[in-house]
């Protein structure tokens, strides 16, 4: 079986996982915004939440195009948010992992539309990780200091 056929054979199940993960990440950032120490951090988390929701929507659209069915994704549990600094550090690691995961999908994708989708998604995830690092310095109150 050639690589393109294998890519497509496994893609629907990967997309279901990605839809679930991106939806979960969107909810996580929305909840994290409630812990934000200032408006700048709150705005950043809400921007990330919207980005992650858009990633899920993009993957749902691809799933539908491939299968002709709406994706059946298990319900997303409400996120358990650790203390602020731990949450930031965990998200930096998660976002950098997503950067790599979607970058690998981009390189493996047999058609341009999927390559572009995964590439752009990987860039946005990488941007999230980098921007999260800016929240680790300059926090004045003890509760949010990293």
Residue ranges and their predicted role:
Residues 1-146:
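Non-heme di-metal
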